[in-house]
């Protein structure tokens, strides 16, 4: 179970996220929505450790993560898809994913392996990386340098690297942004498949409400940094507070 308890952050006198408390259970996909400037990405940054909270806390599986940095939270089971800033651009797509798989599996094998064990492990890492690339339709790009990828394939690689981490929690911030009509369905299909694993928790920031209503089991609405609605998609989207805050529908005069 992922939880945030009264999670807040202030920038000077501005409260960007205001005491947001939420619990996200395994086997669910929660979409976090709201107008521009609502605090969605800032909230994501607080959860993943990219920003330090001014107050409140983050918990995963009963363990407090608030004082941990982003890398430590990743090791604890939080996985977030990021722009390609921490890769080896001169290496191939396959090599980058294989390194991510290897890093994830460090410590799972006994030390002092013989040469045959080392070779077998290398082969296993390669097969796992190839399987991940196939799942995001990137197998044809396996030998290409990361720096040569077009935008749509970069987004696919972000998801591939997230899968290599084998996290308990998958965090997607607008995963299809900038992708064309042929590319976006690949990522959405992958998220649907991830959703079938009832041991995983998925958080999704997404502006496309047709995608949200199709994929989400639950919608959390932020407005001016505060949680203003939380529930099943049909109920939340029909509520007056969401019509006003998120959709910008003005109140009718009495």
For the regions a protein language model found, what residue spans apply to each?
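Glycine-rich phosphate-binding loops of nucleotide-dependent enzymes
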Residues: 1-254
